[in-house]
């Protein structure tokens, strides 16, 4: 990659007319083994700081991510003020530093579908598309190194009647730089979005065909 043409940009006060909301409420997840290709990539010769972390700098003429036939992403709902995406610098030697991305979600409801999802991805790598409340979509994972559940993830039934209950996954991904989809990216777009599986009730774990395979974990 050629970085010689990047022009630095100053960081002025945040525009009060922009969407500056914090948090994450929605994420999409798919096991790496179910993905054929990630077509949205960094530009080879970025010219701005935005370019440096943007993937698919302009809208693609194909899906941003291609899955195997019959496979796709599931949507995960996170409760208000309970979802967060954080990047932490790691490494001490200049030239060897990188980032650890950590996406934390809380899906309310200690139900079979949610518990089953955690059990299913416990020992495998996944690709995650996180929708931030500010409108940006971040990609965690690549074909060589997917995101993984961090150690110590919790699922809880709660104790008191007023306690929260549900799953609290934290998905981690080590990366050299962030992967943020282009402005205007829409995961549901049939041309350049991502394959998303049909909705399934989180209460019953059943879809409208009577199958008991978890495909989506949504709020109720």
For the regions a protein language model found, what residue spans apply to each?
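Mixed-charge, glycine-accented linear interaction segment located at domain edges/termini
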Residues: 145-219
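Solvent-exposed edge beta-strands and adjacent loop segments
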Residues: 2-6, 14-100, 146-161
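Generic structural motif
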Residues: 11, 32-35, 108-112, 133-135, ...
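Structured, beta-strand-rich domain cores
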Residues: 76-146
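N-terminal alpha-helical "arm" segments
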Residues: 1-29, 192, 197-206, 210, ...
């Amino acid at each position: 990659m050629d970085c010689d043409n990047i022009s630095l940009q100053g960081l002025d006060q945040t525009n009060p007319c922009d969407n500056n909301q914090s948090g994450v409420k929605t994420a999409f997840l798919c096991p790496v083994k179910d993905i054929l290709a990630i077509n949205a990539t960094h530009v080879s010769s970025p010219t701005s700081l935005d370019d440096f972390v943007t993937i698919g700098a302009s809208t693609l003429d194909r899906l941003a991510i291609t899955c195997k036939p019959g496979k796709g992403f599931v949507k995960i709902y996170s409760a208000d003020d309970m979802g967060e995406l954080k990047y932490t610098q790691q490494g001490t030697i200049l030239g060897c530093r990188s980032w650890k991305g950590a996406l934390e979600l809380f899906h309310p409801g200690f139900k079979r579908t949610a518990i089953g999802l955690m059990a299913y991805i416990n020992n495998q790598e996944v690709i995650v598309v996180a929708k931030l409340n500010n409108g940006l979509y971040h990609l965690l994972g690549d074909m060589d190194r997917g995101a993984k559940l961090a150690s110590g993830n919790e699922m809880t039934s709660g104790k008191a009647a007023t306690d929260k209950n549900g799953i609290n996954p934290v998905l981690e991904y080590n990366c050299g730089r962030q992967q943020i989809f282009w402005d205007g990216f829409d995961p549901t777009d049939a041309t350049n979005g991502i394959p998303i599986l049909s909705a399934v009730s989180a209460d019953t774990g059943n879809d409208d065909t009577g199958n008991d395979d978890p495909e989506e974990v949504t709020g109720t």
